[in-house]
Amino acid sequence: FRHWLTALPDARQQGKVVYNKIFCIWSALSIFMQALGSRRQFDREAVADAARTTHVLLDNLNQLAGTEQQDILHGDALDDYLCSLPSCHLEQIPPKMVQRLIRMRALDYARLFGLYLIVIDATGIGHYHKRHCRHCLTQKRNGKILYYHLVLEAKLITPEGMVFSIGSEFVENSDPSATKQDCELAALPRLAAKIKERFPRLPICVLLDALYANHNVMALCDHYQWHRIISFKATRLPTAFREFHTLKSLCPENTLVTRIDDRYQRLSWVDDLQHDNHRFTGFDCLTYNDDGEQIYFAWLTDLPLNARTVVTLANHGGRKRWTIENQGFNNQKHQGYELEHAYSENNNAAKNYYFILQIAHALLQLLTHGLVAAAFKSVIGTMKNFFIRFADSLRHELISPRAVCPEACAPIQIRLAPT
């Protein structure tokens, strides 16, 4: 990890640089890993550490960065470096982390029929009542113009709910002469090209919501040889959806009723449906209990479906699309990472903070599902408690030099197990 940070460029005037670039990145990571929520709170913690007899937070940041800084930098100094660092460099680190996990086979258990599940979806990362920058997207609401920023994310997901970013594409207005705003459908080909370049031979199944149920997206998946499971709704493919429900009643042999825990599931599938020149299988799942509560989902896929695979594809494939929303976006917005907070007024720096947040989230997921997994369940319990204990440890307990020594850590391999 440190050699990736060492390779980052530094455009600052070198004769006047006080804080090492790696120290800057670890300082930014500590904002998210301590759930501080802002640069201002980071400054308060730096002042508190300087007032103590022993400066444990400073020593630990130096230990992690391999530096010998004399004090913790101010949040504005951190922002200066991230303003000068082109965001394309930090953008490469989250997918490199995933590549490393794949090479050490730590994520093999997460495959579904040999395929890694990649969820692609967009989320808002900032909303403003005034124009924030020239890249802002705009939307009229109640007669007023809302300015906002959007990012299209691709995350590799695991059965127990871990999410790792493998690609990000910011949806933003970059051409002043354009007659249309950028949108997530337009951003998808850009994101897909990045993923294919970084993971050219990775066996992938993409999970997408109904917005992407169209000819262009299916053609894109075919071009990159990606399998797909896409939400299937009448509002997006009305003709194919009507045909699916008509044929479903004529194929009773393609229906399976099963029970999972206290709920029943009725699953049906119809092969050889068509949209334009794309053929696919439609399948759905009606989940209900003894009290009459019902939940309905439907999907389309190019994967082979039968009575042996439909339960797995529905429950561990199609329904897992929500992982990016629940364990990804919601956690990053509300569990202490404060994804929607404006960490910088500079657009380039804001992107860098976004990528650093993805790195911090990945590191903490590996920690809570790996080294301290047992203690997390039995003692810590919640992420809120974890952030409190982690921050307390970072401020008051010195990290062993051996724990961050590259030579000592080289033989270590991460092993995760399904829950």
PLM segments and residue spans:
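Short amphipathic alpha-helical "interface-anchor" segments enriched in bulky aromatics
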Residues: 1, 308-343
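Gly/serine-rich nucleotide phosphate-binding loop at the start of the catalytic core
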Residues: 1-70
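A short, flexible helix-boundary coil/loop motif
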Residues: 8, 47-49, 57, 254-271, ...
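Short, conserved catalytic/metal-binding motifs centered on acidic residues
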Residues: 27-28, 42-43, 74, 114-125, ...
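Active-site-proximal, Lys/Arg-enriched surface segment
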Residues: 75-160
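Electropositive, glycine- and tryptophan-enriched low-complexity nucleic-acid-binding patches
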Residues: 140-203
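Domain-level cores of phosphate- or acyl-group-handling catalytic modules
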Residues: 178-239
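An anionic, glycine-rich sequence signature occurring as long contiguous blocks
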Residues: 227-321
